[in-house]
Amino acid sequence: YVVGALARDIAMEILEMPPSPRRTADLDVAIALKDWNQFELLKEHLLENHFVKGKPKQRFYYKGADGNNDYEIDIVPFGELEADEKVAWPPEGNPEMSVKCFKDVMNIADTVVIDDAITVKMAPLSGQFLIKFDTWLDRHLLTDKDAADMLYIMDNFYLAYISFKQPVPDEVQETSESFDLL
């Protein structure tokens, strides 16, 4: 399922909210895997289908059949291969990252249809906030971008909720008048 800044941007566009001041140029995809052998098989499949490997272990670039594209994609494995809610890329266990809430967020992922052609699962804003909070706990001394992303989600999630909130039906409003207040 799609996570990261692009998931945030897609959700905010669907909700017709203002764009984030911090834009992204990559796609982060969380994939539940049984073990690191499955990650290697996935890597081989990507390399056979117009992707090239980037330097970071999770990074790939989609080149396309004509070789003219250069779209960055980070694959974030989680699931049975994690230990203590973290993944650590073999053989040296580096990089290591927390995937503490990825299973829970996957269970509440939204289904999004893009351009009437592509259907993807995507972390909902509440799940994106949880992932950002966990990431902030890991690296808040190194960067403030996760805090800025959380603030943006909180500010705009509330506005989106209010703008899409359904009015209370007249029957409910009328019924409440017939009760005595204590």
How would you label these PLM feature ranges?
Residues 1-182:
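Compositionally biased terminal segments of proteins
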